[in-house]
C-alpha cells in the first residue's frame, strides 16, 4: 500500500468501486477545495489541497469535480471530468 496515495473524503479505499489515479498540484498561496459535482450543483467535499503542495489521489471512475478557492468561496473555477493518469495543476 502506497502511503502517498489519498482517497476522497467518505470513500474508503476498500469500496468495490473502480478507481482512477490522478494528481493535483496547487501553486497558489491558499487552500483549494475540491468538491464532487452532482448534476449541475456542488456535491460533497472530496479533498483539500494545501498551498504549494501536490497530492496523488484515487478517485472513483467517471468522477466530475469542481475547484473552489478560499479567496472566492462562492465561485466555481471549473468543472473537470477526471481522466486516469492526469496531473491537474492549479492555476
PLM regions: where:
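Beta-strand-rich interaction surfaces with strong enrichment in secreted/lumenal proteins
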Residues: 11, 32, 44-47, 55, ...
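Extracellular beta-sheet/turn segments enriched in Thr/Pro/Gly and aliphatic residues
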Residues: 1-13, 75-91
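Short, intrinsically disordered/low-complexity patches at protein termini
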Residues: 47, 56-58, 68-69, 78-82, ...
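Asparagine-centered strand-capping/turn motif at beta-strand->loop junctions
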Residues: 13-14, 18-31, 36
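Short, aromatic- and glycine-rich surface loops/edge beta-strands on solvent-exposed regions
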Residues: 63-73
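Intrinsically disordered, low-complexity Pro/Gly/Ser/Thr-rich segments with frequent PxxP/GP/PP motifs
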Residues: 40-64
Amino acid at each position: 500500500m502506497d502511503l502517498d496515495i489519498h482517497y476522497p473524503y467518505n470513500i474508503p479505499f476498500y469500496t468495490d468501486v473502480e478507481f482512477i489515479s490522478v494528481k493535483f498540484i496547487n501553486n497558489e498561496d491558499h487552500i483549494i477545495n475540491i468538491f464532487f459535482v452532482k448534476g449541475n450543483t456542488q456535491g460533497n467535499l472530496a479533498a483539500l489541497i494545501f498551498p504549494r503542495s501536490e497530492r496523488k489521489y484515487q478517485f472513483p471512475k467517471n468522477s466530475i469535480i469542481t475547484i473552489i478557492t478560499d479567496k472566492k468561496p462562492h465561485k466555481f473555477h471549473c468543472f473537470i471530468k477526471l481522466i486516469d493518469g492526469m496531473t491537474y495543476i492549479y492555476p
